A protein has these predicted regions:
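Internal maturation/activation junctions in enzymes
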Residues: 52-53, 330-427, 439-440, 447, ...
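Active-site rim segments in enzyme catalytic domains, especially the processed small/beta chain
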Residues: 109-134, 282-284, 420-489, 523
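Extended C-terminal subregions enriched in glycine
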Residues: 475, 509-510, 518-567
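Bacterial N-terminal signal peptides
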Residues: 21-30
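Bacterial N-terminal signal peptides that target proteins for export
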Residues: 6-22
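Noncatalytic scaffold domains of N-terminal-nucleophile
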Residues: 35-84, 88, 96-97, 101-258, ...
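Short, small/polar residue-rich loop motifs at catalytic or cofactor-binding pockets
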Residues: 295, 405-408, 430, 479-481
């Protein structure tokens, strides 16, 4: 895109939130190498025929390629080794939840920048019999946390919410994965953790992605105990070398034998607290012993006859996507993909949904959330009427009107019985707070930055949030994680998706769904298509470089939109039902792969 027309502003850190997607379908016990799909959907009335996409001439991902196809089980992930672990669980007779849990623990070994034991996340489940569930294992603020703990004497933020021991919330990942397995898994937990233990104790081959990631974050890791593990000679493990993690292997063995007990009340908890004391952190044995994941009622919504199953608060993802898509539905018929009219509608709906997200959402145990209003069709119709057809509206004016009226990884699982799981987990930043639990082998998160440290001041993603998300002891911080399951108008599973990238998770996830439903794109095209992002403040539209035609840009500028350039808008991993099985893929913006059988 011509830089005369695109004004580049400081981009917010895309790398902070990472996503992994895993789709698993149980079937016959023989394994096939996953191959590019040539399957067509013509002739199957339950699966609408896809329409070839047309992207701008300068766009870096050409339309028309195929995602990976597998008839029985498929795992699509930012990390191929973790994807192989998920497929392995299914071959051993496990269900979708077994595969999701095994993949999650494997990611803690092979994808340490985001996969984790020291973070938290969300899981959305739909069983084949129609039951749905949502597990919230988001981190919580330590009991010693205070509302203004990151505000210095000069009234400015002191930076302690993003790096170092005071940035860490009480981790929920281990409790969450063990609880999900307890309720829905069918294999012994020791078998589910066995692949991750093997990867940690025997090691795996370092690829360029891990090598570069560690090198870029040496400043974050180097001040704590992880330096000796990840930079033993002053440099990260070389590409092609075998990386062994004996401390982490020991921790995983303890979890395999005791579940979450040792992590929250035993020797692993002792190691976490000792690390906190050495570095001046806040997490105590009482914090860990009190932590509990929470089962919640999934958020159910509809869009043009399709059903969405998503995560309710403390995640903001499901609520914001629901409101945004309800507004678009009320706004009227869909304009062509990539047109100024379509981008204007998308940006305007997103702007309004983010205004509500940033001011009204938080931990439901601490704040009263008008959830039924925000997700209602009636409210969306009223909000849609505030969108002009030919000009942009200022966020400051809209905020008054509406008041009156990470690093992350995502994985998605589908098994042959029709059970589906969408999971997103995070450390927030790459390698979290940088604090490494010596003797236990894992990083702790820096999720405290997802709270409103000071109303009116942006966090690392540029989000300006309100008092509903302020810090309080034991409170869950707001998140943009958006694990989502989509059903077709007949109630059949269609899509399992989620993304990485801070608040841009919401944009990527919603636009993949819209591409599939409104524009009838194939999975590859829906994932590859150019994306846009509007989070209310800054009051502007981010567009991916090369993803917009000059004439469209000029029209948006005439309408009063401030448009700026982004290298990328999140990174998703998704699975879609097609004739004869499933397609799955990691985002072309990422470096993972798909494994299936």
């Amino acid at each position: 895109v011509d830089r005369i027309h695109i004004r580049t502003i400081r981009r917010f850190a895309l790398k902070k939130k990472l996503v992994l997607a895993t789709a698993i379908v149980t079937g016959s016990a023989w394994l096939l190498a996953a191959t590019p799909s040539t399957h067509q959907v013509a002739g199957d009335p339950a699966i609408p025929k896809r329409v070839p996409a047309v992207f701008p001439a300068g766009w870096r991902f050409p339309a028309g390629s195929r995602a990976t196809f597998a008839p029985h089980a498929i795992v699509a992930s930012n990390n191929r080794l973790a994807a192989q672990v998920g497929a392995q669980m299914m071959r051993q007779g496990g269900n979708a939840v077994d595969a999701a849990v095994a993949t999650g623990f494997a990611l803690a070994v092979t994808f340490p920048e985001a996969g984790n034991l020291g973070g938290g996340g969300y899981m959305v489940i739909r069983m084949a019999d129609g039951r749905t569930d949502a597990l919230d294992y988001r981190e919580t603020a330590p009991l010693a946390a205070t509302r203004d703990m990151y505000v210095g004497a000069n009234g400015k933020l002191n930076g302690e919410s993003t790096i170092g021991p005071k940035a860490s919330g009480v981790p929920g990942a281990v409790a969450g994965m063990i609880e999900a397995h307890r309720k829905y898994g069918v294999l012994p937990i020791s078998r589910v953790l066995a692949p991750a233990i093997g990867l940690a104790s025997e090691g795996f081959i370092v690829d360029s992605t891990l090598n570069r990631s560690l090198a870029s974050e040496k400043y974050r890791i180097g001040g704590f105990a992880g330096k000796s593990v990840f930079f033993p000679n002053g440099a990260p493990p070389a590409i092609g070398s075998r990386f062994v993690q004996p401390q982490l292997a020991r921790t995983l063995r303890l979890i395999a034998s005791s579940g979450s007990r040792d992590f929250y009340r035993g020797s692993i908890a002792d190691s976490i607290v000792a690390e906190m004391r050495r570095n001046g952190g806040l997490i105590t044995k009482e914090d860990l012993a009190r932590y509990q994941p929470v089962w919640r009622q999934p958020l159910r919504s509809s869009y043009r006859g399709y059903s969405l199953i998503s995560m309710p608060p403390s995640s903001s993802g499901g609520t914001t996507i629901t409101e945004m898509m309800n507004i678009l539905e009320a706004y009227g018929p869909t304009s062509p993909f990539g047109s100024a009219e379509r981008i204007h509608a998308l940006a305007s709906a997103s702007q309004r949904a983010f205004i509500d997200r940033n001011s009204k959402l938080g931990d439901p145990a601490f704040v009263r959330i008008p959830l039924s209003t925000l997700t209602s069709k009636g409210y969306a119709r009223a909000v849609a009427k505030t969108i002009s057809r030919d000009h942009a509206d200022a966020t400051t004016r809209l905020a008054s009107q509406l008041r009156e009226g990470n690093e992350t990884t995502h994985y998605s699982v589908v098994d042959g019985a029709g059970n589906a799981v969408a999971t997103t987990t995070t450390l927030n930043d790459l390698y979290g707070s940088g604090v490494f639990v010596s003797g236990a082998g894992f990083f702790l998160n820096d999720e405290m930055d997802d709270f409103t440290a000071r109303p009116g001041t942006p966090n690392m993603y540029g989000l300006i949030q309100g008092a509903a998300n302020s810090i309080a002891p034991g409170k869950r911080m707001l998140s943009a994680m958006s694990p989502t399951i989509v059903l077709d108008p007949r109630g059949n599973l269609l899509l399992v998706t989620g993304a990485r990238g801070g608040p841009r998770i919401i944009s990527a996830t919603s636009q993949i769904i819209l591409n599939v439903i409104d524009h009838r794109m194939s999975l590859f095209d829906a994932m590859s298509a150019p994306r846009i992002h509007h989070q209310s403040l800054p009051d502007s539209i981010g567009v991916e470089t090369g993803g917009i035609e000059r004439s469209v840009l000029e029209r948006l500028t005439q309408m009063g939109h401030y448009v700026y350039d982004l290298r990328g808008i999140a990174s998703a991993a998704s699975i879609m039902r097609v004739k004869g099985g499933y397609e799955g893929m990691d985002d072309p913006r990422s470096h993972g792969g798909a494994v299936g059988f």
